[in-house]
């Protein structure tokens, strides 16, 4: 057999080994996650096999996901800070981290963590996510009216609202902006719209939790 072909086959075989091991590790992780066995998950992610086959961000993110499932606020905070302080991330990974925990900190009104996440996302190319986070932060946390003109204009556009699944949440944000402006009647009008339009959508529980 041609020597180069042999080398290519060996390289291909070696290359598949980490993939096979990674699949087995992830299968074990899912089983442990289903059983809420955090200690075993931590031990699994700390093994040499996991360190070799699973990239650093993925290992830490899987551990964070376990804490999120258990709603362990203290460990969530510790793990988020650990990832942000010590784990190199690309733009996609930064966005994934922010999406996972941002609304948790909004619910807690944890301004310092929200600011950290905003600063992190500002260094990515995910401008839509940054705008969304900044809009929520300014409206719900800072009590601002920065996005008043933009939201009012968007929600007055019938075609825009009809084809936009985010409409209920935008209505909710505008209701809060009116409240921040001291316009209680308009605030109530848009709050009722948001509650009605969010029924049966992913935003229903989110709006009620932040209401």
Annotate the PLM regions.
Residues 1-29:
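N-terminal signal-anchor transmembrane alpha helix of single-pass membrane proteins
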Residues 17-27, 52-61, 90-99, 125-137, ...:
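Generic helix N-cap/helix-start motif at coil->alpha-helix transitions
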Residues 26-38:
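Alpha-helical transmembrane signal-anchor/signal-peptide segments
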Residues 32, 67, 101, 105, ...:
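Residue at a conserved register position within TPR or TPR-like alpha-solenoid repeats
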Residues 35, 70, 107-108, 142-145, ...:
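Structural motif corresponding to the intra-repeat A-B loop/turn of tetratricopeptide repeats
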Residues 40-48, 73-86, 110-125, 146-162, ...:
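Alpha-helical repeat scaffolds
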Residues 41-73:
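Acidic, Ser/Thr-rich low-complexity segments on the non-lumenal side of membrane proteins
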Residues 138-211:
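Extracytoplasmic/periplasmic C-terminal soluble domains
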